[in-house]
A protein has these predicted regions:
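The feature captures the beta-strand-to-loop junction immediately N-terminal to the Walker
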Residues: 37-39
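ABC ATPase C-loop
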Residues: 151-152
Protein backbone atom coordinates (compact mmCIF):
# COMPACT_ATOMS: atom_id res chain seq x y z
CA UNK A 1 0.00 0.00 0.00
CA UNK A 2 1.18 3.52 -0.80
CA UNK A 3 1.32 6.33 1.78
CA UNK A 4 -1.82 6.25 3.92
CA UNK A 5 -4.43 8.85 3.00
CA UNK A 6 -7.35 7.70 5.18
CA UNK A 7 -6.75 5.97 8.51
CA UNK A 8 -9.83 4.78 10.41
CA UNK A 9 -9.49 3.20 13.85
CA UNK A 10 -12.26 1.81 16.04
CA UNK A 11 -15.18 3.49 14.26
CA UNK A 12 -18.51 2.96 16.05
CA UNK A 13 -21.89 4.31 14.94
CA UNK A 14 -25.42 4.38 16.31
CA UNK A 15 -28.89 5.20 15.06
CA UNK A 16 -30.71 6.06 18.26
CA UNK A 17 -30.10 3.21 20.69
CA UNK A 18 -29.19 0.77 17.91
CA UNK A 19 -25.47 0.27 17.49
CA UNK A 20 -24.59 -0.44 13.86
CA UNK A 21 -20.77 -0.32 13.67
CA UNK A 22 -18.43 -2.05 16.10
CA UNK A 23 -14.83 -0.87 15.97
CA UNK A 24 -14.42 -0.63 12.20
CA UNK A 25 -10.77 -0.03 11.23
CA UNK A 26 -9.43 0.39 7.71
CA UNK A 27 -6.75 2.22 5.72
CA UNK A 28 -6.68 3.62 2.20
CA UNK A 29 -3.48 4.64 0.44
CA UNK A 30 -2.96 7.48 -2.01
CA UNK A 31 -4.09 6.50 -5.50
CA UNK A 32 -5.62 3.26 -4.24
CA UNK A 33 -9.04 1.76 -4.93
CA UNK A 34 -10.35 -0.22 -1.96
CA UNK A 35 -13.58 -2.23 -1.87
CA UNK A 36 -15.75 -2.58 1.23
CA UNK A 37 -17.73 -5.73 0.54
CA UNK A 38 -20.73 -7.18 2.33
CA UNK A 39 -24.34 -8.23 2.10
CA UNK A 40 -27.32 -5.92 2.56
CA UNK A 41 -27.44 -4.64 6.12
CA UNK A 42 -23.80 -5.50 6.84
CA UNK A 43 -22.84 -1.89 7.65
CA UNK A 44 -21.33 -0.66 4.37
CA UNK A 45 -23.47 2.43 3.91
CA UNK A 46 -23.31 3.32 7.60
CA UNK A 47 -19.51 3.21 7.40
CA UNK A 48 -19.50 5.78 4.60
CA UNK A 49 -22.08 7.93 6.35
CA UNK A 50 -20.08 7.80 9.58
CA UNK A 51 -16.94 8.91 7.74
CA UNK A 52 -18.91 11.90 6.43
CA UNK A 53 -20.44 12.74 9.85
CA UNK A 54 -23.92 11.88 8.57
CA UNK A 55 -24.95 9.54 11.41
CA UNK A 56 -26.54 10.79 14.66
CA UNK A 57 -23.77 9.43 16.87
CA UNK A 58 -20.32 8.02 16.22
CA UNK A 59 -17.04 7.37 18.00
CA UNK A 60 -13.52 6.39 17.00
CA UNK A 61 -10.63 8.02 15.17
CA UNK A 62 -10.64 9.15 11.54
CA UNK A 63 -7.49 10.75 10.14
CA UNK A 64 -7.28 12.12 6.60
CA UNK A 65 -3.92 13.16 5.19
CA UNK A 66 -2.58 13.05 8.75
CA UNK A 67 -5.27 15.38 10.08
CA UNK A 68 -7.85 14.28 12.64
CA UNK A 69 -11.31 14.86 11.13
CA UNK A 70 -13.47 12.83 13.53
CA UNK A 71 -15.04 15.91 15.11
CA UNK A 72 -15.51 17.98 11.97
CA UNK A 73 -18.96 18.70 10.52
CA UNK A 74 -19.80 17.34 7.10
CA UNK A 75 -19.05 20.52 5.15
CA UNK A 76 -15.57 20.72 6.69
CA UNK A 77 -14.92 17.08 5.82
CA UNK A 78 -15.85 17.84 2.21
CA UNK A 79 -13.58 20.88 2.26
CA UNK A 80 -10.73 18.68 3.55
CA UNK A 81 -10.99 16.56 0.40
CA UNK A 82 -13.58 13.79 0.80
CA UNK A 83 -16.29 13.38 -1.83
CA UNK A 84 -19.37 11.22 -1.22
CA UNK A 85 -21.60 9.59 -3.85
CA UNK A 86 -24.65 8.13 -2.04
CA UNK A 87 -26.58 5.15 -3.32
CA UNK A 88 -29.71 7.24 -4.00
CA UNK A 89 -27.78 9.61 -6.33
CA UNK A 90 -29.60 12.85 -5.42
CA UNK A 91 -29.41 14.66 -8.72
CA UNK A 92 -31.21 17.97 -9.09
CA UNK A 93 -34.07 16.82 -11.29
CA UNK A 94 -35.07 20.28 -12.55
CA UNK A 95 -31.51 21.27 -13.52
CA UNK A 96 -29.72 20.26 -16.70
CA UNK A 97 -26.64 18.05 -16.70
CA UNK A 98 -24.41 21.09 -17.16
CA UNK A 99 -26.19 22.95 -14.36
CA UNK A 100 -25.89 19.95 -12.01
CA UNK A 101 -22.15 19.92 -12.64
CA UNK A 102 -21.83 23.64 -11.98
CA UNK A 103 -23.53 23.20 -8.59
CA UNK A 104 -20.64 20.97 -7.52
CA UNK A 105 -17.82 23.14 -8.88
CA UNK A 106 -15.01 24.07 -6.49
CA UNK A 107 -11.57 25.61 -7.12
CA UNK A 108 -8.83 23.09 -8.00
CA UNK A 109 -6.40 21.97 -5.32
CA UNK A 110 -2.71 22.77 -5.88
CA UNK A 111 -0.75 19.84 -7.28
CA UNK A 112 -3.79 17.68 -8.08
CA UNK A 113 -5.78 16.80 -11.19
CA UNK A 114 -8.27 19.52 -12.13
CA UNK A 115 -11.76 18.26 -12.94
CA UNK A 116 -13.70 20.42 -15.39
CA UNK A 117 -16.88 19.90 -17.39
CA UNK A 118 -14.80 19.24 -20.49
CA UNK A 119 -12.68 16.43 -19.06
CA UNK A 120 -15.69 14.95 -17.26
CA UNK A 121 -17.57 14.86 -20.55
CA UNK A 122 -14.60 12.95 -21.97
CA UNK A 123 -14.77 10.56 -19.01
CA UNK A 124 -18.55 10.15 -19.40
CA UNK A 125 -19.33 10.66 -23.12
CA UNK A 126 -23.02 9.93 -22.55
CA UNK A 127 -23.27 13.00 -20.35
CA UNK A 128 -21.78 15.17 -23.09
CA UNK A 129 -24.58 14.10 -25.44
CA UNK A 130 -27.26 15.11 -22.92
CA UNK A 131 -25.70 18.18 -21.33
CA UNK A 132 -28.95 20.15 -21.80
CA UNK A 133 -31.20 17.36 -20.51
CA UNK A 134 -32.68 17.74 -17.03
CA UNK A 135 -31.77 15.26 -14.32
CA UNK A 136 -35.35 14.05 -14.02
CA UNK A 137 -35.30 12.79 -17.62
CA UNK A 138 -32.25 10.55 -17.13
CA UNK A 139 -32.05 6.81 -16.46
CA UNK A 140 -30.67 5.44 -13.21
CA UNK A 141 -27.31 4.70 -14.80
CA UNK A 142 -27.10 8.16 -16.34
CA UNK A 143 -27.96 9.73 -12.99
CA UNK A 144 -25.22 7.66 -11.35
CA UNK A 145 -22.67 8.96 -13.84
CA UNK A 146 -23.89 12.52 -13.27
CA UNK A 147 -23.61 12.22 -9.50
CA UNK A 148 -20.04 10.93 -9.74
CA UNK A 149 -19.14 13.69 -12.19
CA UNK A 150 -20.70 16.35 -9.96
CA UNK A 151 -18.72 15.00 -6.99
CA UNK A 152 -15.50 15.21 -9.02
CA UNK A 153 -16.28 18.87 -9.80
CA UNK A 154 -15.70 19.43 -6.08
CA UNK A 155 -12.01 18.46 -6.62
CA UNK A 156 -11.88 15.70 -3.96
CA UNK A 157 -8.80 13.69 -3.05
CA UNK A 158 -10.78 10.64 -1.92
CA UNK A 159 -14.16 9.55 -3.28
CA UNK A 160 -16.58 7.37 -1.31
CA UNK A 161 -18.89 5.43 -3.65
CA UNK A 162 -21.93 3.62 -2.27
CA UNK A 163 -23.03 0.64 -4.42
CA UNK A 164 -22.24 2.31 -7.77
CA UNK A 165 -23.12 -0.80 -9.81
CA UNK A 166 -26.44 -1.66 -8.14
CA UNK A 167 -29.35 -2.03 -10.53
CA UNK A 168 -27.40 -0.94 -13.60
CA UNK A 169 -27.22 -2.64 -16.99
CA UNK A 170 -23.99 -4.59 -17.67
CA UNK A 171 -22.81 -2.04 -20.26
CA UNK A 172 -23.24 0.82 -17.77
CA UNK A 173 -21.44 -1.19 -15.08
CA UNK A 174 -18.52 -1.65 -17.49
CA UNK A 175 -18.44 2.11 -18.15
CA UNK A 176 -18.53 2.75 -14.40
CA UNK A 177 -15.52 0.48 -13.88
CA UNK A 178 -13.64 2.32 -16.64
CA UNK A 179 -14.42 5.66 -14.98
CA UNK A 180 -13.21 4.51 -11.56
CA UNK A 181 -9.95 3.24 -13.04
CA UNK A 182 -9.54 6.59 -14.82
CA UNK A 183 -10.05 8.35 -11.50
CA UNK A 184 -7.31 6.19 -10.00
CA UNK A 185 -4.99 6.97 -12.92
CA UNK A 186 -5.59 10.67 -12.26
CA UNK A 187 -4.33 10.18 -8.70
CA UNK A 188 -7.60 9.89 -6.78
CA UNK A 189 -8.20 7.40 -4.01
CA UNK A 190 -11.54 5.56 -3.96
CA UNK A 191 -13.43 3.61 -1.30
CA UNK A 192 -16.25 1.71 -2.97
CA UNK A 193 -18.99 -0.19 -1.12
CA UNK A 194 -20.18 -3.16 -3.15
CA UNK A 195 -22.00 -6.47 -3.13
CA UNK A 196 -20.94 -7.22 -6.71
CA UNK A 197 -17.68 -9.13 -6.26
CA UNK A 198 -17.03 -9.34 -10.00
CA UNK A 199 -17.23 -5.54 -10.29
CA UNK A 200 -15.05 -5.07 -7.21
CA UNK A 201 -12.38 -7.39 -8.60
CA UNK A 202 -12.23 -5.35 -11.81
CA UNK A 203 -11.42 -2.08 -10.06
CA UNK A 204 -9.92 -2.74 -6.62
CA UNK A 205 -6.41 -3.18 -5.24
CA UNK A 206 -7.57 -4.44 -1.85
CA UNK A 207 -10.79 -5.41 -0.12
CA UNK A 208 -12.35 -5.42 3.31
CA UNK A 209 -15.38 -7.54 4.17
CA UNK A 210 -17.87 -6.23 6.70
CA UNK A 211 -20.56 -8.33 8.40
CA UNK A 212 -22.69 -7.38 11.38
CA UNK A 213 -20.97 -4.00 11.59
CA UNK A 214 -17.52 -5.57 12.08
CA UNK A 215 -14.60 -5.99 9.67
CA UNK A 216 -14.22 -9.74 9.16
CA UNK A 217 -11.51 -9.84 6.48
CA UNK A 218 -8.93 -7.68 4.78
CA UNK A 219 -6.49 -8.50 2.01
CA UNK A 220 -5.72 -8.10 -1.66
CA UNK A 221 -8.21 -9.15 -4.30
CA UNK A 222 -5.87 -12.01 -5.25
CA UNK A 223 -5.84 -13.23 -1.64
CA UNK A 224 -9.62 -13.09 -1.51
CA UNK A 225 -9.82 -15.04 -4.76
CA UNK A 226 -7.68 -17.78 -3.20
CA UNK A 227 -10.02 -18.18 -0.21
CA UNK A 228 -13.43 -19.37 -1.44
CA UNK A 229 -14.46 -20.22 2.12
CA UNK A 230 -14.27 -16.51 3.00
CA UNK A 231 -16.41 -15.57 0.02
CA UNK A 232 -18.95 -18.26 0.84
CA UNK A 233 -19.14 -17.24 4.51
CA UNK A 234 -19.62 -13.51 4.04
CA UNK A 235 -20.60 -12.76 0.44
CA UNK A 236 -22.73 -15.66 -0.80
CA UNK A 237 -26.43 -14.91 -1.04
Amino acid sequence: MSAVMLDVEGLDAWYGRARILFGVSLKIGRGEVVALLGRNGAGKTTTLRALMALVPERAGRVAFEGREISRLPTHEIVRAGLGYVPEDRRVFTELTVAENLEVGRRPPRPGTARWTQDNLFRLFPNLAEMRERTGGRMSGGEQQMLTIARTLMGQPLLVLLDEPSEGLAPKIVEEMAHAILAMKKAGLSVLVCEQNLHFAKAISDRAYIIEGGRIRYEGTIAQLEAQPEIRDAYLAV
